[in-house]
């Protein structure tokens, strides 16, 4: 499907902005904890493939556990390494377990969206007093989580809205607002990981992923029920249409 001009301009602008952010962060890229970076990178790529399709009415979208991993990386490593981790997770999410192959521009757009999201989240986190490598105040943690949710969901919703010529806020409100709980849970889990990492060690910190696994499983069940309900409604609608046509003859 050929995108409307407004959608193409928007997608192109986000890609350019994302590329500029990555290029701007590369000079400050450091790996003081290479094993931690490698572990979070692998975990983010793997968890991004464990995605749940969202029943949006304007296209296809999904959520995954990679958000919490990326958020944890931001708290522990800072924005530069996290941008690499987040863009890799976006690539994985758009490349694996797909019902149909994504066009290249969608994959690049998703990667750019996460680069922009990480940069904005990092800015909010530091403005609220957060520091990397140690757990900050609840205000900084929740503020950063809300920034991540708002920037990421709004960026994706805008793309869907422009592609389908619908109001951006309507698309965001109807299809993305409800997922805010997953971001709150992810931020709390990331905070627990950082705290346990500092006090005990990295292997014990992995226990904080249990709430995320439960959240993921809950979403799977919930969205499966929505999909089943939508299928039943479609079947009844089709049956009603066929019955009406028969009676009209």
Task: Annotate each PLM feature.
Residues 206-249:
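Acidic/His-rich, divalent-metal-binding segments that scaffold phosphate/diphosphate chemistry
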Residues 1-174, 178-203, 209-217:
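Short helix-perturbing small/polar motifs within transmembrane alpha-helices
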């Amino acid at each position: 499907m050929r995108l409307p001009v407004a959608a193409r301009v928007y997608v192109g602008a986000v890609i350019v902005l994302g590329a500029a952010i990555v290029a701007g962060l590369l000079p400050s890229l450091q790996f003081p904890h290479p094993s931690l970076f490698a572990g979070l990178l692998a975990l983010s790529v793997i968890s991004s493939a464990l995605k749940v399709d969202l029943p949006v009415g304007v296209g296809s979208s999904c959520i995954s556990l990679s958000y919490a991993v990326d958020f944890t990386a931001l708290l522990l490593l800072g924005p530069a390494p996290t941008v690499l981790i987040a863009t890799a997770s976006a690539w994985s999410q758009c490349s694996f377990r797909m019902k149909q192959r994504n066009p290249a521009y969608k994959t690049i757009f998703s990667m750019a969206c996460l680069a922009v999201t990480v940069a904005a989240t990092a800015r909010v986190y530091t403005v609220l007093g957060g520091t990397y490598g140690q757990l900050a105040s609840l205000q900084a943690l929740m503020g950063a989580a809300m920034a991540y949710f708002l920037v990421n969901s709004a960026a994706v919703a805008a793309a869907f809205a422009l592609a389908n010529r619908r109001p951006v806020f309507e698309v965001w409100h109807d299809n993305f607002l409800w997922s805010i709980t997953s971001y709150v849970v992810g931020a709390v889990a990331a905070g627990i990981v950082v705290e346990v990492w500092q006090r005990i060690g990295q292997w014990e910190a992995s226990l904080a992923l249990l709430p995320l696994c439960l959240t993921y499983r809950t979403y799977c069940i919930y969205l499966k029920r929505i999909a089943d309900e939508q299928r039943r409604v479609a079947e009844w609608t089709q049956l009603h249409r066929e019955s009406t046509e028969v009676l009209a003859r």
